[in-house]
Amino acid sequence: MITAVRTGQSAPGKHSHAAEFVKELATYLKSKHGIDVTVKTQIGGPVGRICMISNYENLAEYEKAWNKIHADPEFHKITQKASGIMNPGHTHDTLWRSA
């Protein structure tokens, strides 16, 4: 099992807008690509951090899913909404495997 975690940082004063944006993106990924995404906000540590968590059977499934997503023009259109509400350059992707 592979768990993908994408963490981003909301712009100052935009945390609630950023959380709504990430939830919209998660809803789209489920409806269009069948990917279950959990959205979490950090409650300790740096303020304004938001993450999306999704699970895949293996790395090949992860790569197949994200290649399809990155080829989706509607996905790119939705991500443009992040401008002004997410801090650019503060996105961090990690992949985890079951022990």
Language-model-derived ranges and their functions:
Residues 1-76, 81-99:
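Short S/T/G/P-rich N-terminal loop/turn motif that feeds into the first structured element of a domain
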